[in-house]
Amino acid sequence: MARYFGELFMLDDDVHACKTLYAEKGESGRVKDKDKITRIILSLHEMASLMDIHLFGFTSRISPVMYNETSFLSLSKMITGCSYGIIYNKNTWWNEELRLKEDFWISCYMKYKERRVLTDLRYNFEQKNTFVNAGGLASIRNQEEERRSILFIKKNFGDSILLKSATNNGKDKTKQLVQYNITCKFKY
């Protein structure tokens, strides 16, 4: 798809809200205007294009307390799979053996190949609980497939992939459904 379109932004069908993480206490933080959401996405695409970055997206952080106003953009953080964009080049490649965690794969692969991924830490695209929903990847998403995908990524990227301890990452039910997760730290 990326090779065919060249430049694209993918937004999962289970995304139900765009939120600002820089909202002040008492402010909603929910972005409801579709035109504003489109401008947010296009603005990040333009920044990525100007910086010659081929993978860009938004944070998976969900709480304003996780927001650092002096570091609202990152070149080293991962993107979240529910909302990211590609500006195609020879390095934008997904391993088709991987059925889950493809966002993690492309983040690691682009960080390895190009040493940077543009992540906007000001906005989060919120998803419904996808681990148990019908449709999409629900038919293959289970603990064993998650484990297989994580071990496959670890096999390919080695010591750069670290297993995270059990956490609920601020989301209900995740702790019970996912036994472990991973993070990435390249030594460069």
Region locations from a protein language model:
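Anion (oxyanion) recognition and catalysis
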Residues: 2, 49, 111
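Conserved catalytic core of nucleotide-sugar-dependent glycosyltransferases
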Residues: 9, 15-105, 186
